[in-house]
Amino acid sequence: MAMNYSAKDEVDGGPAGPPGGAAKTRRPDNTAFKQQRLPAWQPILTAGTVLPTFFIIGLIFIPIGIGIFVTSNNIREIEIDYTGTEPSSPCNKCLSPNVTSCACTINFTLKQSFEGNVFMYYGLSNFYQNHRRYVKSRDDSQLNGDPSALLNPSKECEPYRRNEDRPIAPCGAIANSMFNDTLELYLVANESDPKPIPIPLKKKGIAWWTDKNVKFRNPPGKESLEEKFKDTIKPVNWHKAVYELDPEDESNNGFINEDFIVWMRTAALPTFRKLYRLIERRDDLHPTLPAGQYFLNITYNYPVHSFDGRKRMILSTISWMGGKNPFLGIAYITIGSISFLLGVVLLVINHKYRNSSNTADITI
């Protein structure tokens, strides 16, 4: 039996179905997206449009990069490594496994005065806070003061969820590994006078406002913090309970302790720094940290040699762009210079071949 051919049938995806049945077709819906009729714009790249773009990018990026680089260089910063792995280091004695509590002192010199507010950081190296299991090892409901989560922490906190059949507060690997060295800074104002001047270190104002006031809360109730946490136990590696982090200041104790909050904000890279203290400017007439001799008193509690880590203390001022970061300025200058150089090269090529084309046209 012969079948009549119909161009319409081919376009529609096949012959019509039996009478009364639904028409079968493989043709996509007649929409602009499925029929690829969406409006499009394709720039026509000519020398008149490309060359100015390269030059404009170069002329914008280079001055911005120079400004950022100069600003970064004007930031005062000094790093003091106190890991103690070197035999000559004053903190080398603290690496002995038999030492339970150790203190050491490191002398250093500030060659230039530090103006304005000065920020003291502690820095760690080779510490991978971005490990997936480590990052997830916390209970945000518990940290937000939820009474039920306080007594029944999340399973994400394992193996730091319970100890001695009691819930750990705060639970998880992040809290368990909290940095606990104590750093004190002193100025040697007069070498003939052995009594140093302690530098006042402010321990509040170092955490993000949203963390301090929204994400972290102590359990509700009028009882003392010790009563609120009486059915819990401290993390395995802690020397004291969470309600003893700052017993002299109730607004900085427990889950809302700012040292604890800063530590709980995990770092993305294995080498990082976290804000430890603030050194506020006294007045406009005197530098915050005058040039001279200083020494750093360290209560060495935090072990890093087991994972080949390093510890350091950083003193730094800041600017409108934050802390010292020469890379950003160098990146802007590099990109701007490459763009400007490409513009010059393309301009020479365009000028050369355009003249050759004009000469060929005249010859013909």
Swiss-Prot record:
Q: What processes in GO biological process is this protein linked to?
A: phospholipid translocation; positive regulation of neuron projection development; positive regulation of phospholipid translocation; positive regulation of protein exit from endoplasmic reticulum; protein localization to endosome; xenobiotic transmembrane transport
Transcription among the record's keywords? no
Expression across tissues is:
Expressed in photoreceptor cells; detected in retina outer segment (at protein level). Detected in hepatocytes liver sinusoidal endothelial cells and kidney brush border of the proximal tubules (at protein level). Expressed in brain (at protein level).
Q: Where is this region: Disordered?
A: 1-28
Where does it localize? Membrane; Cell membrane; Golgi apparatus; Cytoplasmic vesicle, Secretory vesicle membrane
Pfam families the record matches: CDC50
Example GO CC term: the record gives: apical plasma membrane
Query: Which ranges sit in the Cytoplasmic compartment?
Result: 2-49, 350-364
Alphabetized, the UniProt keywords read: Acetylation, Cell membrane, Cytoplasmic vesicle, Disulfide bond, Glycoprotein, Golgi apparatus, Lipid transport, Membrane, Transmembrane, Transmembrane helix, Transport
The record lists its disulfide bonds as 91-104, 94-102, 157-171
PTM (free text): N-glycosylated. Contains high mannose-type oligosaccharides.
> What domain notes does the record hold?
The N-terminal domain seems to play a role in the reaction cycle of thr catalytic subunit such as ATP8A2.
Question: What is the name of the protein in this document?
Answer: Cell cycle control protein 50A
Q: Which organism is it from?
A: Mus musculus (Mouse)
Name of the coding gene: Tmem30a
